[in-house]
């Protein structure tokens, strides 16, 4: 805990009034940022796999059309035709799977962004800055004392800054 002011001190708006050790919050922010970058990389990979699946679909569709034409004319074997149908259907399924991978990666990015934002918000909460210029008129806590408060209700008064 850092408490660089004393009762009677003159402070300017934005001066540090209270600070807690930010190390774990910095680490959490770094982890969240790394997770976001990993998610973005996963999206890029999914898009690349989708492009590859699209190319394979075009090739499979051409082979299917050729094989169908040859088979219908009696010039192609049933095995070749069946293989072309199978490859064509498989390539369609691959496209669908890669589209879902892209969707999943997009949702993962949104989740990672939310985690990063939460970590950044928590890091910002490691400091309390003077809301206005003035004099510290009441300092009710000392270094080492605990302060109660939650996200749902207001915590204890640590100090007052009067103008």
Predicted regions and their residues:
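Elongated periplasmic alpha-helical coiled-coil
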Residues: 44-45, 99-146, 163
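Extracytoplasmic/periplasmic beta-strand context in beta-sandwich domains
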Residues: 15, 27, 55, 79, ...
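A short, hydrophobic secondary-structure junction motif
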Residues: 14, 91, 159-163
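Long, amphipathic coiled-coil "stalk"/hairpin helices in large membrane-associated assemblies
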Residues: 1-42, 73-80, 139-142
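Sec/SRP-type N-terminal targeting helices
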Residues: 25-33, 50, 54-57, 79-81, ...
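A structural signal for short beta-strand/turn segments enriched in small hydrophobics and glycine
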Residues: 8-17, 67, 112, 119, ...
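Soluble periplasmic/extracytoplasmic beta-strand elements of cell-envelope proteins
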Residues: 4, 18-19, 56, 63, ...
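Alpha-helical hairpins and coiled-coil heptad-repeat segments
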Residues: 37-99, 123
